[in-house]
Amino acid sequence: MKLQISWLLSFFLSMNVLAETKLFVLGTGTPNPDPQRMGSSYLLLVDEQPYLIDFGIGVIRRFSELTEEWGGELKIDTTSIDHAFLTHMHSDHNLGLSDLIITPWIMGRENKLKLFGPDGLDDMAENIIKAYEFDINYRIYGTQPQNKTGYKFEFKKIDENFIFQDNNVKVEAFKNNHGDLEESYGFIFKTDEIKIVFSGDTAPSEELVKVAKNADILVHEVYSQSGFEKKTKDWQIYHAAHHTSPMELGKIASEVMPKKLVLSHILYWGASSE
């Protein structure tokens, strides 16, 4: 089997998995404030139903750029976003939550946002709503014709037994290996025809290798070896325990044998992207 590898150096990439299923990488960024890369975020579109996996900074703007309203090709808009899955509670994966809660509602979303993630995500969402209470009340009770539901959310905590299923997809969570962070997960998305696995932030993970076998697409994080070697020893220890080197990822890919390997959340630390 020939392994295809996609390096994600632009701000988003679209892959037509099937005619009715598309994967868009909205952001490949990290905590480093690279102006060319938005925060970690992925859009899986199945029969015109969007599912977000992580929602780093810039997620709504990148999503909007794909829509017909803002010059793209997708016929949906931000009001369609009502399912979002979070791998873990690190800020580079959830800084876009306030935008995800507020902006689609302002644009007309009436459905509650369905949030799936670790402990703490519900508290974060509640606190965002509290922080924007003035703005929300102004829009509802002022002269704007705004609905009273679209900024609200429903939360379901994920664990290694988590399963979500609707008419389009089945989603399962698995524990990965993000150092000393206990609640850190990857996701398996399955339709009738395809299997897409998102590693989340992780060092090499035996569980990932097991569940990702023969995936159609494996989206996996990686760091630059040359950038890593420039870090101080304490940071090298940290990153080696929390993330995946190119050599380690090559071994993972040879065991999993996905049809396509997509590299994301790429930690360069000033190294060249070449």
Task: Provide a role label for each language-model segment.
Residues 11, 103, 128, 252-255:
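Alpha-helical structural signal in soluble globular domains
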